């Protein structure tokens, strides 16, 4: 299944593993914020499609927001992504409809790196209507998931996905 979708598995021992140290508390990491509890556990592994994750995530900002994006929200998202792209920031989002889709699409149009963090297995394009977007992202950026191939999207997985989006970026911009 991984080979069919062009994915690979990485672990914390992989050279491609991103720097999660500032966000996750593990192995006695005293630098992680003390307010984090169980949700601050680093993933054991990640499934990846596209460019090496450490490279694309090195200078990244999350751009996220509502699924029901307004015309103003679309315009604001595109402007934010354009400004970040001018300074070579990678755009990270969850691949959902709304602001996430606008952010990824704008990044691709501006030829800046983008990372889609899936709330399902790496072999499952969700939402289905964004399948072409995920394929474009995998060609020029990176698609990742902490869920095993074959894992379907479930409500609780979106929260876990959001934690990963926040952990791998220098900051988060919430549009609408």
Language model regions located:
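Glycine-biased, small-residue-rich flexible motifs in mid-sequence functional cores and linkers
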Residues: 11-176
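A short structural micro-motif
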Residues: 4-5
């Amino acid at each position: 299944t991984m080979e069919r979708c062009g994915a690979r598995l990485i672990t914390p021992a992989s050279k491609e593993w991103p720097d999660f140290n500032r966000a996750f508390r593990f192995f006695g990491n005293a630098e992680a914020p003390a307010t984090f509890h169980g949700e601050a556990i680093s993933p054991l592994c990640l499934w990846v499609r596209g460019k090496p994750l450490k490279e694309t995530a090195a200078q990244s900002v999350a751009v996220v927001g509502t699924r029901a994006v307004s015309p103003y929200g679309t315009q604001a998202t595109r402007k934010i992504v354009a400004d970040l792209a001018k300074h070579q920031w990678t755009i990270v989002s969850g691949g959902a409809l709304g602001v996430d889709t606008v952010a990824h699409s704008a990044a691709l149009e501006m030829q800046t790196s983008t990372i889609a963090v899936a709330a399902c297995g790496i072999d499952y394009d969700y939402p289905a209507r964004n399948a072409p977007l995920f394929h474009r992202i995998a060609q020029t950026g990176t698609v990742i998931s902490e869920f095993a191939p074959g894992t379907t999207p479930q409500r609780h997985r979106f929260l876990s996905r959001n934690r990963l989006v926040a952990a791998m970026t220098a900051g988060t911009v919430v549009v609408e």
